[in-house]
Amino acid sequence: MVTDKGTIKFVLYTDDAPITAGNFIDLCGENFYDGILFHRVEPGFVIQGGDPYTKAPGKEHLHGTGGSGKNIRLEKSPKLRHDTEGTVAMARSNDPNSASSQFYITLAPTTFLDNPPGYAVFGRVTEGMDVVKSIRKGDKIQSVTISDAE
């Protein structure tokens, strides 16, 4: 993932989260994330992006509400937890089966997010955690390339 601040690399857990990782891979293949802004930054907690409304001028009031138009069911594995910074997971509404395109990267261990119903972890940052920590609200995702998956 190339951002305004630099490159972030992460591994995707295609074996333990095939639906969620597959959804992310599909969206990347469509260049869905190119030009999308990080619309939520909570220091010490998460950065969040993936809302297509962030590409549309005048739609600031909708930031955080958009998606790809396709929801996926909540997919959890006991092996995949929010136990370290750099956890990559899908954001969703109160409906556990409402994940679509928005994702977040944790800035610290956030194990409370594993409490039922929880959130679908599908990856982990392997390089560029310094970039993750430098992201601010409004920083842009320039492109996302899938080169390999675990």
Regions found by a protein language model. Give the residues of each.
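Cyclophilin-like peptidyl-prolyl cis-trans isomerases
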Residues: 1-150
